[in-house]
Amino acid sequence: MGTILDKIVEQKKKEVAELYETYTPVKTKRKTHSLVEALQQFTVIAEVKRASPSKGDINLHVDVRKQVGTYEDCGAGAVSVLTDGQFFKGSFHDLQTAREESNIPLLCKDFIIDKIQIDRAYETGADIILLIVAALTKEKLKELYSYVLEKGLEAIVEVHDEQELETAIQLNPHVIGINNRNLKTFEVDLSQTEKLGKRLNEEKLLWISESGIHSKEDITRVKRAGAKGVLVGEALMTSSSISSFFEDCKVNI
């Protein structure tokens, strides 16, 4: 059967093959916005997430333009957009809409396994590319990270355990994302942030906490662990008061 991640990667291989048949990258350069600069103070990366394999439909018919505008008005330092269609019901159209609406750093949240996906994300308006260590060989991770740099973009290199963390540290990446969700089981454990954060603090690397962040208590916990930001999707997509969530993020520790 394989894990959920295995299934997603298999689907991405099909999508990449289709991209090579249907898409020709444009060789134009454009201005980009820096997440690293945004993370000089504690930052919320607010996500547009219609659905997920673990939760099903979350906010399927969201008005992306309105949601992103609200995020920016409330003080988001960056916006993340799911572009995977099969498992998360996102699209590159959502990414494009977010770019049209916003002038803050924009993350293409997908399962990137090939350079052509980075080309497409760049052309659609992304400033940041997510590279998931669990989805890539060490060689492929290094190759894709180099390509991100070549394009003038930034990367969040995502890890879930100690082994993946050591692989990520070798790249000395812009930002490391500790995913509290195990992509093989989709279970969430916020203690991963505390556990792996210690090592990243020792290395003096810039890092954020991703997944499972729903409350003021969660924000306090990851701030105490040393996170310079949080990536939040579900909590914001289902919130009746997005501004209240952002107020909670201002908690002092």
From Swiss-Prot:
Pfam families: IGPS. Pathway: Amino-acid biosynthesis; L-tryptophan biosynthesis; L-tryptophan from chorismate: step 4/5. NCBIfam families: PRK00278.1-3, PRK00278.2-4. PROSITE patterns: IGPS. SUPFAM superfamilies: Ribulose-phoshate binding barrel. This is Indole-3-glycerol phosphate synthase. The keyword Lyase applies. PANTHER family: INDOLE-3-GLYCEROL-PHOSPHATE SYNTHASE (PTHR22854:SF2), TRYPTOPHAN BIOSYNTHESIS PROTEIN (PTHR22854). Keywords: Amino-acid biosynthesis, Aromatic amino acid biosynthesis, Decarboxylase, Lyase, Tryptophan biosynthesis. Its EC number is 4.1.1.48. Belongs to the TrpC family. The keyword Zinc does not apply. One of its GO terms (molecular function) is phosphoribosylanthranilate isomerase activity.
